[in-house]
Amino acid sequence: MTDVTVIVLVGNEERHIARCLDKLAALEARQIVVVDSGSRDRTKAIIFEKIVQYGVVEYHDHQWPGNQAAQFQWALDNLSIESGWILRLDADEYLTDELVDEIKVRLPQVNDDVDGVVLKRRHVVGWLDDAWVKRGMYPTRILRLFRRGKGRSDMKLMDEHIVVDGKVVEVEHDFVDHSLISFEEWKAKHRGYAKREAQSYLSGEESTGEQAAKKAAYYKLPRYFRAVIYWSVRFFLKGAILEGPKAWRWCWWQGLWYRWIVDREIGCAKRARSRS
């Protein structure tokens, strides 16, 4: 048994949750806890099927507090966790077999002064025929594994991170972010993200994680111009242009369109404030 509790946040994830839990089975975690925010599809039924199948899976329903950071912090504060380590996952994410093996071998060997483990995220885009977008995005390093009692959510509205005070180490292998939603669903989801990111920016929230300095520099640039600069860096300097049509399309939508609508939402919010 691996001395880790996996916390998975879900909400209408019938397309993803079975894959996530099936991949976790090989980890042999002490606990797998799914926190649902009132799913209205088959998510809950699928989870209970996996409870019967694997035994270690637990289900908790908690009303959506408005953002992922607050939901995860609720889980940390209220769940009965007995393991020494905690791993945080979304339903559309899963561990590669290589990462499972690495965690099982390395986790017992981590020094006592290490509080967190940084994982490498591989981004696979379902609406681009399951393309793995590498240049300009891989690897994204993110702290997802930490000692019980040593990690906390940064409580940001958008792009939340786990914060630890002690040392961190990095693993060699990947976990995969592979959403199966359609292109239209992706756009609708990112319009919502744009509103939250604009709200986060205007409220003065400071970024955390390894991208904090880059994000601070980005927001010092003029609106809209910075979106073009961001796209240009991803497309030309980081080599997306060399990866083919799928990478071009992803870079356009995620690297330019999304950043553009964030700036549009910031402008709309500023104008609304000035009129009130």
Region annotations inferred by a language model:
Residues 69-73, 87, 97-271:
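Catalytic-site signature of metal-activated, phosphate-bearing donor transferases
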Residues 23, 36-46, 64-65, 90:
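A conserved acidic beta->alpha catalytic loop
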Residues 30, 56-58, 114:
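Short, conserved active-site loop motifs that form the nucleotide-linked donor/cofactor pocket
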Residues 12-26:
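Short, well-formed alpha-helical segments that are part of the catalytic scaffolds
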Residues 3-5:
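Cell-envelope/extracellular polymer assembly enzymes that use nucleotide-activated donors
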Residues 44-78, 82:
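Conserved donor nucleotide-binding strand/loop of the catalytic core
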Residues 18, 41-50, 98:
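Acidic helix N-cap motif at the loop->helix transition within catalytic regions
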Residues 75, 82-94:
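Short beta-strand-to-loop acidic/aromatic patch adjacent to the donor-nucleotide binding site
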